Amino acid sequence: MIEKIWFNNHPLKYFLWPLLWPLSLLFKMISGQRRDAYLSGKKETYRPPLPVIVVGNITAGGNGKTPVVIWLVEMLQAHGFKPGVVSRGYGAKAPNYPLVLDENTPAEHSGDEPRLIRKRTGAPVAVDPVRANAVKALLSEGVNVIITDDGLQHYALERDIEFAVIDGARRFGSECLIPLGPLREPMSRLDDVDFLVNNGGKAHGREFSMSLLPSQAVNLKTGQKRSVAELQKLVAFAGIGHPPRFFKTLENLDGDVVYTQGFADHQDFDKDELHALAKKGMNMIMTEKDAVKCEEYAQDNWWYLPVSAQFDEDSQQQILKRIKEVMEYYGSPST
């Protein structure tokens, strides 16, 4: 319901306005004072000895940040850089922190997004609720640039380049701050961001267009690949920021979807619940982020759909140029 109020101008918004508007003002005051305290030096910040790139957004919910992080990592790897990724690890229950992932680290320890990034890219990934500690853990891993998955509002960690990812369809909704609207920070915050990335919509102003390109569905148990259109009677579920985006993608791929189920972002899945859900069709399909959480008990008819961020060549070159400038400032040219 809250997203309908934020993004769809639901009539209930006007009844809740007297309650939510003062709370939004309070949120603006507290978050603004917090940011000013870090930027003015009143609160301590950490300046890593290597470049830091932040990928985040100013709205609550999923906007496509993790695919952008993966794209950045792979692009930098292709140009001879050695990126490492840090994350807060939402939903993670690590035995200790900071946690540097290896290929066998379970998603329950790292969180779903760090596990996915490590699996897709092979890059060093560290998780810690205090991102500075995650960065310090990667300094011995041979990295020469840090990318943070989310953290635009984590001002305790100093940064060199900022990306803000925008949901191209829903954009900023009511353009009000939480809880009256979806904004974590005022719209004016975007003026300070280096790169605005429009995910799946028409770019405005200086925004760069980005699309998520789906590939073939992958079987969780065998690794077999098939087109979504070939899979009959699909049960689709998604535990991401905006599940309807995933369901729309399946529709665009001519998927034979007979049932959909949305879950909360980063939600821990119940094994029995998913097994029961799978019985509603012949095959079950999920996002790649969800797949890393249920690999161990997947059935033969469970599939996931990988997606990859796509930028045009001009956008990629502008981004790469800026990163190289920062890398050269730190004395870390590509090999």
From Swiss-Prot:
Enzyme Commission numbers on file: 2.7.1.130
Recorded catalytic activity of this chain's protein: a lipid A disaccharide + ATP = a lipid IVA + ADP + H(+)
GO BP annotations listed: lipid A biosynthetic process; lipopolysaccharide core region biosynthetic process
Example of a GO cellular component annotation carried by this entry: plasma membrane
Pathway: Glycolipid biosynthesis; lipid IV(A) biosynthesis; lipid IV(A) from (3R)-3-hydroxytetradecanoyl-[acyl-carrier-protein] and UDP-N-acetyl-alpha-D-glucosamine: step 6/6
HAMAP family on file: LpxK (MF_00409)
Protein name: Tetraacyldisaccharide 4'-kinase
Species of provenance: Vibrio atlanticus (strain LGP32)
Gene name as annotated: lpxK
